Each structure stands twice: as C-alpha cells, then as structure tokens.
From Swiss-Prot:
Binding-site positions, Zn(2+) 2: 107, 110, 113, 121
Keywords annotated in UniProt: Metal-binding, NAD, Nucleotide-binding, Oxidoreductase, Zinc
SUPFAM superfamilies for the chain: GroES-like, NAD(P)-binding Rossmann-fold domains
Annotated residues for binding of Zn(2+) 1: 52, 77-78, 162
Domain of life according to the entry: Eukaryota
Biotech and industrial use: Liamocins have high bioactivity against the pathogenic bacteria Streptococcus spp. and can be potential new specific inhibitors of oral streptococcal biofilms without affecting normal oral microflora. Liamocins are also able to inhibit human cancer cell lines such as breast cancer cell lines T47D and SK-BR3 or the cervical cancer cell line HeLa.
Reactions the enzyme catalyzes: L-arabinitol + NAD(+) = L-xylulose + NADH + H(+)
Organism: Aureobasidium melanogenum (Aureobasidium pullulans var. melanogenum)
UniProt protein name: L-arabinitol 4-dehydrogenase
A GO molecular function held by the record: L-iditol 2-dehydrogenase (NAD+) activity
Disruption phenotype: Affects the ability to produce liamocins with an arabinol headgroup.
Necessary cofactors: Zn(2+)
Amino acid sequence: MVKPTKSNIGVYTNPAHDLWVAEAEPSLEQVQTGEKLAPGEVTVAVKSTGICGSDVHFWHAGCIGPMIVEDDHILGHESAGVVVAVHENVKSLKVGDRVAIEPNIICGECEPCLTGRYNGCDSVLFRSTPPVPGLLRRYVNHPAMWCHKIGDMSYENGSLLEPLSVALAGVQRAEVRLGDPILVCGAGPIGLVTLACVKAAGAEPIIITDIDEGRLAFAKEFCPSVRTHKVDFKHTPEDFAKAITELGGGVEPAIALECTGVESSIAGAIQTVKFGGKVFVIGVGKNEIKIPFMRLSTREVDLQFQYRYANTWPRAIRLLQGGVINLEKLVTHRFKIEDALEAFKTAADPKTGAIKVQIQSFEEGESR
C-alpha cells in the first residue's frame, strides 16, 4: 500500500450554490498519526466517489425536501478506498484493507435499528445529507462497522455498490420473481442499475422507459434483451399503458419499478401494471403529487416506496464479485478531485451523455 502523502481536500457547496475544492478534515498529519480517530473508527483514503443526482441537487437547489444546505457542506456518499489508519480497539479491519463505505451512521438503539431496518433510524447520520459532511475528500474517518471489505474489487466497482444497494433494496422489497414481466421507468443511473438487477433476477420481458433517446440507446447496449420506450409527454397515462402492453407482446407488467419520482411517470406506471400488480417507487420526487386513486383501488394495485437501503451491501458485493451483475459500463467519465467543478458540470449536463461520473484520487503508482 502507498502511504498517504497528499493534503486532504474536499468538494464543497453552500447556500449560494457555489461549488469549490478546499482543505478538509482530517488533516494529512492527523491521518498519518491517527490522532483524530474515535473508538471504533478507521481512516479511509477515498479513491473513487460517484456523483449522485442528489449531490447535483444539493448544489443546484440547496435542498431535498427538509434536508437543507445551511453552511459550507461537503458532498458525496458513493465511495470506496483503502484503510490507512485504525483505532486501537478496531479488530475487523487493518491498514491496507480495500473497503466500500456504507455512508450511514446509526444509533443502534431505536426500533428501526433493533428490528433490522436501520435505514429508518431516528438519529441516522447519512453522509452528504446536510448537515452531515460527505465523502468527497481524500481522507475520511468512518465507523469500521460500515466499511465493507471488497477484496481485490476495483475502487470504481466499490463506489458503485451504493447505487447498487439502492436498486437491490427496491428489487428485493418489490419481490421480483423469475419470469415476472417488469417495467423500469427511467434510464438514469438508478434505473440502469435496477435494470441489471431485474435481469439477474430472471425477469422477462423487461421494458425500460425514458424521455431521452440517448439513454435508451445506452440501456439497449447495456442490456441487449431489454425493450425500450421513449416517453411522449403528449400521451395520456392510458396511451402509455397501451404502448407498454403492446411492446410487451400483450402482457401487462406485473411490477413497475419507478426510478424517476416524476408524477406523470408514476401515474403511467399505475395505469399500466396488471390487476393485482405493484408499482414500487425507488425515485425521489416532489413533496406532494397527485395519484390516480380509483385506478389503484379498482385494480388492486399496490403502491410501495423505499428509503435508502438496509442490509444490502454484503449481497451487493457478492453479486459484483461473482460476476452476476456487471456495472462497469456505467462509469462514463472520470475526473481528478482537483477537477471536481468540471466533473459536476459534466454530471449535471444531459448533453454530455454522462451516466455515472466518478471523482478519483490516487497516489502515484497506486493500484486502482
């Protein structure tokens, strides 16, 4: 392992929607001595971090619902790196271990924590969600229990474990079964990872929708057997349902995995699934939306949601390590941490064709 030699810098935003790179904690000296580590913590030299849509949203909008950027704030929560220091009471990890960082810190005492649904922790601290500083920096101290060993997996793949966990949580809770006809709404990063998950789960046929022809073409390249549909805003939910059913060979989807959070897309999914079907919303949308209540009621359609994930990371690691799912094509752009502003501009601009933009920080000669 190459020892840390570079100063710690992080990627910040603020209420004025600025984005910049500046010094961050812990300092290089603190990393080298381990003096800032609390019991149970390790220092991770972060090597690859994916830019999530929520990072761009915090930069541009300054908030997501009640989560508001009120001060200088470090972004990023999709990270992997190498352990460079451990507190003396940590036995599960050692210096040199390659890890992916599950970006939450929980209380371990509330009902959700005690019943295994820690994503609902009353006191959760989630990296990059204000006011908790994120992982987009060279070094970060984090509880060892939330640093998952990834063996010889690349850091790029390690940082894809976070969006994979989001999709995996949705597919598990939606109870996708072998041979289920599935509709995936949205061909952004989460939609594409969800597509990979339902394909691995044996769903057939699979249809994916989007408003962007470029993203649909990427989805077809990523998963050749998928059927694609370009959304037309002029169409009613009924028109959408008819088109999807025809594309599926007359078979209505059993489950729609909605990855956009857009009101019209959710309404279209509700209109489309079969009697007794399910619409599972993975995407994040507005505080309030209108839904076709009577369609849900008279067709016995279940409408479900998720909030982040719980207990998915070990499973996600096995899926990537075993080659059951391959997400490498999703990383379309890579930038050094010093070039974070350009990275964020690329991630935010639909014209770039970016799917997953990663920010990376490597020492000279270091394994990736």
